[in-house]
Amino acid sequence: MSRFLLVCIGGAIGTGIRYLVAITAPRLFGTAFPYGTLAVNFVGSFLLGAILHLGLATTLISPTMRLVLASGIMGGLTTYSTLNYETLEYVSQGAFWLAGLNIVATVTLCLLAGALGVTSARWLLGS
């Protein structure tokens, strides 16, 4: 199977997971803040950090599998465009503090999650 098709399949899986989170998060946490978008970006950043470190530092994840997991599944799971849309919606409603919070929380937490993913992978490898 071609790498292109594998990435497409991975993207479909990631997108399906994102959709499930998007319909579940408002029921669990309400609609005052886009918790679903924050959650998929946070988890995706953590997993991407771990996947890339494990794939580059070891032979545990082959280059093809790394491509499927990172570009496919994590690419489909995470969503920068939804972050932008939700932030612009806050701005159009005059909720500037929520717009700012959305940007700062996402960027800060996702950077931390990515670093935690790499650190966790290093810990698993004992390095």
Residue ranges and their predicted role:
Residues M1-S127:
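Membrane-interface helix-loop junctions in multi-pass transporters/channels
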